[in-house]
Amino acid sequence: MTFLSPLSGFLGLPKKSKSKNQVCVIPFGLEKSVSYESGTKNGPKAIIKASHQVELFDEELLQDSYLNFQLDTLKPVKIKKKLNDALEQLSGIVTRVLNRNQFPLIFGGEHSITPGIIKAFSKQYKKITILQIDAHADLRDGYDGEKYSHASAMRRCLDFPNIEIVSFGIRNLCSDEYKYYQTIPKRMKIFWGKDMKNWNFNHFKKLIKNKNAGMRLIHDALSSVANRVRLA
């Protein structure tokens, strides 16, 4: 694997930490099944560029928190043409990062990348809980003839038997998605966007306590979720 220099990578760090806590940023600008506007392939580059304007000093902890972990940023790879092949490619990259005892932080790209990431984790942990912050359920079994479409991302994650999902902010889904959701009460819990004022975060904590958990954050959820999560 090839890495960017600390100054050109995520956050533009002035120096490397000597901490044993290791994080690896994986830029993966996938754009294969977008159904509205294009440009997801430029996401990782834009995030990394914007991150260079972030203050490194943490005003809550009153310290340079970035020194508490070693952060590497992978050099972007050439993504394979077929969607399924691209997901296998990403799964392989995440697996190599996990084998280096690093925590992977993946920047997309359209959100069909999720099952590729989860495949790598599912092989290394007995059970995983995904925290999904999203406006869409993404539980379709396929969309526009594509099984691995962005609209099917969470459905494909549930193809792995050791995966559970806790979702926040969902406000868009079709009837087939809702029918499927009703069949998996032990594997998925949705905190609906319409019920945001009544969300019980103690219930949420119980759902993920003592579990291996990963987060999937989709920007279209932020308008309805961000303030509520911050206040909680």
PLM regions and their residue ranges:
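Conserved alpha-helical scaffold segments that buttress catalytic/binding sites
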Residues: 2-232
